[in-house]
């Protein structure tokens, strides 16, 4: 049952963050240390979406490539837009639909600010 749901969740994450591809970001998908990682990269930043066993998280990297010049959790990039208490609770919920929706909405509404943070 667990393995049947995982591809559905993977597709759902891709659908919710598809607006990044429309903005010219390139998607790379891979596993690292037991975590699923969706990496959306552009010339200005790299948005990594971690779908990990402990939950769900979004990290923004700035610079020309690995190692990045700056790497910040989305809560540091958008402190006034994210209620940390709600975000912490949602991150620990193993990425249910509401968590994915929450972060997709935050990123889509604030993409300009994210791209020009540093």
Outline where the language-model segments fall:
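Intrinsically disordered, low-complexity regulatory regions enriched in serine/threonine/proline
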Residues: 1-19, 27-118
């Amino acid at each position: 049952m667990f393995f049947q749901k995982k591809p559905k969740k993977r597709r759902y994450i891709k659908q919710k963050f598809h607006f990044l591809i429309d903005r010219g970001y390139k998607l790379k998908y891979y596993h690292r240390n037991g975590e699923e990682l969706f990496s959306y990269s552009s010339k200005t930043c790299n948005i990594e979406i971690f779908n990990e066993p402990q939950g769900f998280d979004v990290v923004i990297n700035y610079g020309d490539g690995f190692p990045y010049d700056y790497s910040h959790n989305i809560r540091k990039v958008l402190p006034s837009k994210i209620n940390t208490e709600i975000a912490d609770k949602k991150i620990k919920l193993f990425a249910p639909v509401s968590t994915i929706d929450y972060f997709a909405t935050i990123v889509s509404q604030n993409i300009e600010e994210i791209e020009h943070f540093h």
